[in-house]
């Protein structure tokens, strides 16, 4: 009979739906969960063979948290724009004066890879400090071949330096590259024919995203990009129905999207198509708050038809300058009227589904990677009750406790 590496006893945990369980035991072996369940059903040989035991004293253990939608690789900031917005200056006027997303594009292009790592690493470490063990990072502030690849390389490097799992998403279709101003179709053609294949060939991309909106890319252009991704066997995601209902969610679902994100203007048809495709709804309360949006995502509709809901930070310099997934959890309860179990599932199991990783992470189940967080609380509601607190007591990544 083999020995287990770690035995966690007398823990409270949550299941994949976010419901709390008491008196639980977790057996860790070779970086994975070997066994988990009620402590009174723990096989005796695990008790006898464990190399290390930890009595959790009823404290909560969750899966490692997952931030499944971020843009945290970028240079500079847009605090000066925030000051202007508070003075009543419109986004259109800010953009005309050289601000907006293209200002971040310019600063990101001007930064070296080393500078991008130096500026972005603190944001990733802030997430890690809150018990996040997997982070999705999008490109989208390069908008040309050289700089999109640079961003993706930096994202990969950040995961290695920070010691947590990073999944990369190619978001060249975030805005039209400035060199293609006035000719968005030429940019989309270049993206599909040159940029995306290069990222794939260099093994820098895990998924492909498109911002489908009247101010960004059309339904036809989004479909062209989705087809290019499909031809390269890359899964897709979509910034969909954030500012209007364009039918992007239905299109993305037709291509088997892992997730559709934002979704403030999602309708029933789009939601039903997402259910059929097992597409997750990623809700982003940070952007809702920072942009002072009035239209909430239709949580009741998503709940009614059975669309899984994830929560993420949307960490970015323009519309959600945050690195606190814990704060987003509280906001999801308060702004979107999500229940505590829904929110706990949203940053664990549902977030893993949004990355196509539910077979390996996102829940405490035998066979899954041992990404776990031990909290200094006993009631899971406290994770949503507090604002960005408490911080983890200990975090485990692939079976190893990390600092």
Swiss-Prot record:
Q: Does the keyword Cell membrane apply?
A: no
Which residues take part in binding Fe(3+)? 69, 71, 239, 314
Question: Where in the cell does this protein reside?
Answer: Cytoplasm
Q: What class of enzyme is it?
A: hydrolase
Q: What's the superkingdom here?
A: Bacteria
Which pathway does it take part in?
A: Amino-acid degradation; L-histidine degradation into L-glutamate; N-formimidoyl-L-glutamate from L-histidine: step 3/3
Give binding positions for N-formimidoyl-L-glutamate.
141, 316, 318
Q: What keywords are annotated for this sequence in UniProt? A: Cytoplasm, Histidine metabolism, Hydrolase, Iron, Metal-binding, Zinc
Instruction: State if Hydrolase is listed as a keyword.
Output: yes
> What role does it play?
Catalyzes the hydrolytic cleavage of the carbon-nitrogen bond in imidazolone-5-propanoate to yield N-formimidoyl-L-glutamate. It is the third step in the universal histidine degradation pathway.
What this protein is called in its record is: Imidazolonepropionase
Q: Which organism is it from?
A: Legionella pneumophila (strain Paris)
């Amino acid at each position: 009979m083999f020995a287990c590496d770690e035995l966690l006893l007398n823990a409270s945990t949550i299941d994949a739906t976010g419901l709390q369980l008491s008196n639980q035991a977790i057996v860790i072996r070779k970086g994975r969960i070997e066994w988990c369940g009620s402590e009174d059903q723990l096989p005796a040989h695990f008790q006898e063979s464990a190399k290390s035991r930890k009595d959790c004293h009823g404290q909560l253990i969750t899966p490692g948290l997952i931030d499944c939608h971020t843009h945290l690789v970028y240079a500079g900031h847009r605090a000066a724009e925030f000051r202007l917005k508070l003075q009543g200056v419109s986004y259109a006027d800010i953009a005309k004066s050289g601000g907006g997303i293209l200002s971040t594009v310019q600063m990101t292009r001007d930064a070296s890879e080393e500078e991008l790592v130096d500026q972005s690493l603190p944001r990733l470490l802030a997430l890690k400090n809150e018990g996040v063990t997997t982070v999705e990072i999008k490109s989208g502030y390069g908008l040309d071949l050289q700089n999109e690849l640079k961003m993706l390389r930096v994202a990969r490097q950040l995961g290695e330096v920070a010691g947590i799992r990073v999944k990369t998403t190619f978001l060249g279709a975030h805005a039209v590259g400035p060199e293609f101003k006035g000719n968005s179709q030429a940019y989309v053609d270049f993206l599909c024919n040159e940029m995306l294949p290069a990222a794939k060939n260099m093994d820098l991309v895990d998924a492909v995203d498109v911002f489908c909106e009247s101010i960004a890319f059309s339904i036809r252009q989004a479909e062209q990009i989705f087809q290019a991704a499909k031809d390269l066997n890359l899964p897709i995601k979509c910034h969909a129905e954030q500012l209007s209902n364009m039918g992007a969610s239905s299109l993305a679902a037709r291509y088997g999207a892992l997730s559709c994100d934002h979704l403030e203007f999602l309708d029933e048809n789009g939601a039903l198509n997402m259910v059929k495709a097992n597409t997750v709804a990623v809700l982003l309360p940070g952007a809702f708050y920072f942009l002072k949006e009035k239209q909430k995502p239709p949580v009741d509709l998503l709940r009614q038809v059975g669309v899984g809901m994830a929560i993420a930070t949307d960490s970015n310099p323009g519309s959600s300058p945050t690195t606190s997934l814990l704060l987003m959890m509280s906001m999801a309860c308060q702004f979107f009227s999500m229940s505590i179990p829904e929110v706990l599932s949203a940053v664990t199991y549902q977030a893993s589904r949004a990355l196509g990783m539910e077979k390996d992470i996102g829940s405490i189940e035998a066979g899954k990677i041992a990404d776990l967080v031990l909290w200094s609380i006993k009631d899971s509601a406290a994770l949503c009750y507090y604002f960005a607190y408490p911080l983890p007591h200990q975090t485990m990544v692939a079976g190893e406790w990390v600092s």
